[in-house]
From Swiss-Prot:
Protein name, per record: Ribosomal RNA large subunit methyltransferase H
Residues binding S-adenosyl-L-methionine, per UniProt: 100, 119-124
Species in which this protein is naturally found: Thermotoga neapolitana (strain ATCC 49049 / DSM 4359 / NBRC 107923 / NS-E)
Free-text function comment from the UniProt entry: Specifically methylates the pseudouridine at position 1915 (m3Psi1915) in 23S rRNA.
Gene Ontology CC: cytoplasm
One example GO MF annotation: rRNA (pseudouridine-N3-)-methyltransferase activity
HAMAP family given in the database record: 23SrRNA_methyltr_H (MF_00658)
Amino acid sequence: MRIRIVVGGKLDNFIKMGVDHYKKFLRRFCKTEIIELKRTHGGSVEEIVKRETEELKKRVLPGSLMVVMDRRGENLSSEEFAGFLKEVEMKGKDITFLIGGPYGLSEEILSEAHRVFSLSRMTFTHGMSVLIVLEQVFRAFKIIRGENYHY
């Protein structure tokens, strides 16, 4: 299984350290890839969101499930997320998680996504969101395999 996370913006160095930490742990479960997009500048907020959304969509793995991370999405427990991941893994599919930049994502991409999940009702930076998604993917695989980590 391949998991790609496409994020609208560059990651800070302290986030990259955490990303490397979880990518190392995830090696035995799946292949992970993080794609950082350059921030879009110029124009109205709506124009920026539209351009960033188009760039995110271009990076979706062919044939993968497109999962958008957005505060308007469905809130899942770690166990429910593990169930989702297990189902996708059993179907032999890959997943591309899309995380928008500071202005978020367009309504269009929310309607095109296979699933829309929320990490929390709180707002996180795009970098923190990447780190949280990676940790939850790792936690999900540990739950699926019945290994100690999640209590």
